[in-house]
Amino acid sequence: MIRVIAICILAAIGLIAPARADMSAEAALASVAPFYKALNAEFAKDSPDLVRQATAPDWVSCRGNDLCNTRDEVIAGIGQRLKSIPDLRWEIKEVLVAGNQVTIRGEATGTPAGEFMGAPYTGKSFKLMSIDVHTLEDGKMVRSYHIEDWMGAVRQISAK
């Protein structure tokens, strides 16, 4: 009981930081938009700079709880992906904000230029959904968790 009263007193006199207010969806979108632009084939030559613009130097991108890549590794991976899918287009479909966390529902479309994730070349295109959760500090992405339906894309290009 004394602990509860002490916390209330500290909060009342301003010694406990207030909860961080949510940033606006517009501010969140402005912070992450360069990263999503970097995922588009149209901007392939600018992709590394766009990723750097949106991310902190120590940013990590995680495809699992402990499967994370550094910014430089992600930049290299995006370059490879843009070569294998030369018409890749990634669109932001929805932006949700909670504190300094930004969740993006995205959609990617493209046509692989050759064998793709073990699937033989068919000339078919795919459309997939992605969900990304980004933590922002000072307007930069510092940590991201992402999931894309690449197996759904493989099924689409492999369908008879």
Q: PLM features: residue spans?
A:
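Positively charged n-region of N-terminal signal peptides that target proteins for export
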Residues: M1-V4
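A solvent-exposed, acidic/Ser-Thr-rich amphipathic alpha-helical stretch
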Residues: E26, A30, P48-G99
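Bacterial N-terminal signal peptides
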Residues: A6-L15
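Short, low-complexity N-terminal intrinsically disordered segments enriched in polar/charged residues
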Residues: A17-P57, A159-K160
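A short hydrophobic beta-strand element
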Residues: N100-P112
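A short, structured loop/turn motif at beta-sheet edges
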Residues: V95-T103, T135-M141
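Exposed beta-sheet edge and beta->alpha loop/turn motif
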Residues: G110-E137
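Low-complexity, intrinsically disordered terminal/linker segments enriched in charged
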Residues: V142-K160
